Structure formats: structure tokens, C-alpha cells
Regions:
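Beta1/beta-strand and adjacent pyrophosphate-binding region of the FAD-binding site
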Residues: 1-12, 165-172
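Glycine-rich flavin
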Residues: 2-4, 20-27, 32-165, 198-202, ...
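Flexible, glycine-rich terminal cap/loop adjacent to redox cofactors
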Residues: 7-14, 18-35, 40, 47, ...
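Glycine-rich dinucleotide-binding loop and its adjacent helix/turn
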Residues: 46, 138-191, 195, 223, ...
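Short hydrophobic core segments
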Residues: 7-9, 114, 129-139, 171-172, ...
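A conserved FAD-binding loop/helix module that cradles the flavin
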Residues: 212, 299-358, 429, 437-448
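FAD-site-proximal beta/loop scaffold in flavoenzymes
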Residues: 151-166, 249-326
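A Rossmann-like FAD-binding core segment of flavoenzymes
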Residues: 108-111, 115-123, 188-287, 327, ...
Length: 448
């Protein structure tokens, strides 16, 4: 039986970061992974998605904005196979880097599926492995609704396995994944239809920002269908036909489910360790990533808490600091987490939406500043693209509790503003900051 100070079940970003930090502090650590290192993010998530997004950005620059800048495209050929090949080569290089970090930090890689035997022991390929601390970082998988013919549709995982792009695609869902895939595929030339159950996509985001995204979808010909609940799918001569509860139908070459994710817990034998799930089926943890079992922890998507790769990484490193570096009170701060939706155009946000701020502070205690403009990049062309920015402040000193934007370059603006908001910046601090001109980000420090 091998014994460790700490092991991670799951070799995604969270598990890898946790073990590397533990190893840095001298702990004997191991990562257990049954598939590919890197998890969802590196292999079938944010990394290949971002590369596709860059591809869409280049296509847009060439064909949409290029002519007004004096560049004439001599052809419309797009070699998707080449993009796919280069994308996968990049991912292979990213995965190969883990070996070096494991070696530097003394972390073992154990390949296989882990199952709990008891609270401190797991079985991998029949071998028993024991550890004082066990971290569950197994991530999540796409949820496919239980309706007739659902298996005819694929998931976001399947998109990155396509050897060629389809003629048309129907995407079912309203969150990050649905919106990002819709924007990328549409910009790369796929006839794209996005179906949402309610009145708009991205319902957890500020409505002022989402309104602009919906308008841009309409402007560019990406078809958004609201109040559409799928009832069944069937294969037809024309493709895959979706039947909706309102009696309407839609046929596309491919159908993609982007209707949420479920935790990877089914094969862990959690009951043998005594680990419990919450009402949503995710592993229940406290603010220190502790499960109800002493010495067993969980982080990342398997907990259902802020399902973002940097969150899992930060939570894992913080946990290892607490366990192996004497920082006994170290815990992940889940407030004011910045995030970007790589829609077209991108959305960036940190802190509370206006709606959330009203609930937390009261309508009378908040003040909102907005700006609406056309970025210089598109303003000199015939394809003018709107940008919108918003600051949400609270209290007499107008502390900035929310910052939101949509438009060209927003994805690269948010990180710096997130630091300011984390430090408690006020509207007066923003006003006292000299703007950088001409940029989009100057709008955040010149709003009145």
C-alpha cells in the first residue's frame, strides 16, 4: 500500500494546483487521473474554446472590418482542419508541461480511476492508496435532459471533436457555454440558432449588458429564440429536428446541449467514506473546502461553487497553504470574483449586478453610472458595434460594488479593475484616476 500526506482525485486544474502547492511545502503528494491531465478546461473547455474564439476574431477582422481599413480579402477560404490541428497541438504542449511541474514539486501521477474504500483509503486499478488528506476535484460533466431522442444531440465536449464544421447548428441553453459557442460558430460561418427557455440568455448577468448582447446577435444574424422548451428530438432526412413544447420545430445539422453541468461523483463510492451531497447533488463543503468527513475536502466544479477554473486553482492553493504552510485560517474568498464571457463581443464583470445590489443594499442606497458608445475600432467602419459599461456603487462613500462591460477589448480590461474593487475602491478613486486615451477602458474612470 502506498501512503501519502495528500492526494487529489482528479487531474484537472484544481487538483493539479493543490498538489503542486502541497509539494512545494514538502508534502508527499499525488494526483490520480483516469483520463487526460488538465481536465475540462485544458482539453475540452476554456482553452480550445478561447483558441476558437481567436479564430472567430480573426475572421471578423478580415471580412467584417478589414475592407473599411483598406484591406481587401481575395478569398473566403477557411481551413478549419488547420485550425483544429494547431489547437490540438497547443493543448498537447500544455498537457506536457504538467510533468515538469510534478517533477519539480515531487508530485506523483497515478493513472486510473479512484474509488473510496474508507475515509483515508482509495483503490486505483486494484491498488490501495492511503492518505491523511484526500481532495476530491473530479469536476463536472454536461447535463443532457431526459427527453425522447436527447441522445441525438451532442454536448460542448463533442464540439471540439468535430473534424469539420457543420452547415448549421442549434444550441440549447442560456449560459456561458451556449452563448460562447453560438458566437464562435456563427462568426466562423455556421448557420447558428440559439434557443433559451426564458426571455433572454445569461440571466445571472446585468440586464443592461445582456440587452446589448441580444441586440448584437440580431445585428449579426445570429438567431436567438426565447421561451423555447425542447420536448423531443428526432432524426430526419434534413438533419436533427427539435420539437418544442409550444408545437414549433427546428431542424439543424447538429444539435448541442448546453443546459448545465452535473458533478462527477457517481463512481467515487462516496458512501464508503461518509461524504454527503447537497440538495443539488454537489459535494457539500464549508468555507474551508472541508466536507463533513475530517481529512476529506472538495473543490472546483464538483462542489457547484463558482464553476470557473481560476476559482478551483485558487481554492486548491489556499487549501494547501492551510494544511502545509501554517496558515490555519486561510480560506477562499468567493466574493467579487471577476469573470469574462467570451461572447461576440466579450462581456466582463466583477461584483454585484444592479439587481443584486438593490437586494443587498436597498434601492435608496445605491447609485449607478452607465456609458454607451461605439468603440473607435468599429466606429471607422460600416459595422458599428455598441459598447456598454456600468458601475454600481453603494453607500455614502459610493464604494464600487459592481463593474460590468460589453464591447471590444473588455475581456482584457476586467482583471485590473477587479484588483481595485477587491481593495474597496470608491467612485471618487475612479474619478481621481487619469484616463488612458484613446481606449475603451477610459470610460470606467470618466463616467458621471
Amino acid at each position: 500500500m502506498r501512503e501519502y500526506d495528500i492526494i487529489a482525485i482528479g487531474g484537472g486544474s484544481g487538483g493539479i494546483a493543490t498538489m503542486n502547492r502541497a509539494g512545494e511545502h514538502g508534502a508527499k503528494a499525488a494526483v490520480i487521473e483516469e483520463k487526460k491531465l488538465g481536465g475540462t478546461c485544458v482539453n475540452i473547455g476554456c482553452v480550445p474554446k478561447k483558441i476558437m474564439w481567436y479564430g472567430a476574431q480573426i475572421a471578423e477582422s478580415i471580412h467584417k472590418y478589414g475592407p473599411d481599413y483598406g484591406f481587401t480579402s481575395t478569398g473566403n477560404e477557411f481551413d478549419y482542419a488547420r485550425l483544429r490541428k494547431n489547437r490540438e497541438a497547443y493543448i498537447d504542449r500544455a498537457r506536457s508541461s504538467y510533468g515538469g511541474s510534478f517533477k519539480r514539486n515531487g508530485v506523483d501521477l497515478i493513472e486510473g480511476r479512484a474509488e473510496f474504500v474508507d475515509a483515508h483509503t482509495v483503490s486505483v486499478n486494484g491498488e490501495l492508496i492511503r492518505a491523511k488528506h484526500i481532495v476530491i476535484a473530479t469536476g463536472a460533466h454536461p447535463h443532457i435532459p431526459a427527453i425522447p431522442g436527447a441522445e441525438l444531440g451532442g454536448s460542448s465536449d463533442d464540439v471540439f471533436a468535430w473534424e469539420e464544421l457543420p452547415k448549421s447548428v442549434a444550441i440549447l441553453g442560456a449560459g456561458y457555454i451556449a452563448v460562447e459557442l453560438a458566437g464562435v460558430l456563427h462568426t466562423l460561418g455556421v448557420q447558428t440558432d440559439l434557443f433559451v427557455r426564458r426571455d433572454r440568455p445569461l440571466r445571472g448577468f446585468d440586464s443592461y449588458i445582456v440587452e446589448s448582447l441580444v441586440q448584437e446577435m440580431e445585428n449579426t444574424g445570429l438567431n436567438l429564440h426565447t421561451h423555447k422548451v425542447p420536448a423531443k428530438l428526432e432524426e430526419t432526412e434534413q438533419g436533427i429536428t427539435i420539437h418544442f413544447e409550444d408545437g414549433s420545430t427546428h431542424t439543424a445539422s447538429q444539435v448541442i446541449w448546453a443546459t448545465g453541468r452535473r458533478p462527477n461523483v457517481e463512481e467515487l463510492q462516496l458512501e464508503k467514506a461518509g461524504v454527503t451531497l447537497n440538495e443539488r447533488g454537489f459535494i457539500q463543503v464549508d468555507e474551508y473546502q472541508n466536507t463533513i468527513v475530517d481529512g476529506i475536502y472538495a473543490l472546483g466544479d464538483v462542489t457547484g461553487e463558482k464553476e470557473l477554473t481560476p476559482v478551483a486553482i485558487k481554492a486548491g492553493r489556499t487549501l494547501s497553504e492551510r494544511l502545509f504552510n501554517g496558515k490555519t485560517n486561510a480560506k477562499m474568498d468567493y466574493t467579487t470574483i471577476p469573470t469574462v464571457v467570451f461572447s461576440r463581443p466579450a462581456i466582463g464583470t466583477v461584483g454585484l449586478t444592479e439587481e443584486e445590489a438593490i437586494k443587498e443594499y436597498g434601492q435608496e442606497n445605491i447609485k449607478v453610472y452607465t456609458s454607451k458608445f461605439v468603440s473607435m475600432y468599429s466606429a471607422v467602419t460600416s459595422h458599428r458595434q455598441e459598447a456598454r459599461f456600468k458601475l454600481v456603487t453603494a453607500g455614502e462613500n459610493e464604494k464600487v460594488v459592481g463593474l460590468h462591460g460589453i464591447g471590444y477589448g473588455v475581456d482584457e480590461m476586467i482583471q485590473g479593475f477587479a484588483v481595485a474593487i477587491k481593495m474597496g475602491a470608491t467612485k471618487a478613486d475612479f474619478d481621481a484616476t487619469v484616463a488612458i486615451h484613446p481606449t475603451g477602458s477610459e470610460e470606467f474612470v470618466t463616467m458621471r
